[in-house]
Amino acid sequence: MTVLIDQNISHLIVPQIAFLFDQLTHVKTLGWIDWNDHNIFMSAKKQQFDAVITLDEDFNKLLLQHGTPPKVIWLKTGNCSTARLTEIIIAHKDAILGFLSSQDFDCLELYG
């Protein structure tokens, strides 16, 4: 599974959770750091990312407008540290991996 991390999450999380995914990329790596959500979503779609991990509800709205790919993993945690986001993602790894392999759902909301 190829997963993109949105700009509202620090790029420092990548090495902490990379083991969970086949490919994990931060928007910073792609040079998309100052792009708006629509451009990020549509570029992720064009490049066939399986999912976007974000803190931003706009991605769910874009998903409803444009469909998958990518699916959306929406971290509804509010502002918290990169360490805390890492803990939340790892704690929910089974749900995330099940979601990514499922055809039934397009958005996974995670709470911390």
What are these regions (language model features)?
Residues 31-39, 57, 80-84:
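Residues at secondary-structure transition points
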Residues 5-6, 54-55, 77:
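Small/polar loops that bind or transfer phosphate-bearing groups
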Residues 1-2, 112:
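Absolute protein N-terminus
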Residues 44-63:
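Acidic, metal-binding active-site segment of PIN/NYN-like and related structure-specific nucleases
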Residues 64-69:
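Glycine-rich loop at the start of a catalytic domain that most often binds anionic cofactors/ligands
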Residues 70-112:
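C-terminal structural segments of small proteins and small subunits
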Residues 2-50:
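N-terminal first-folded block
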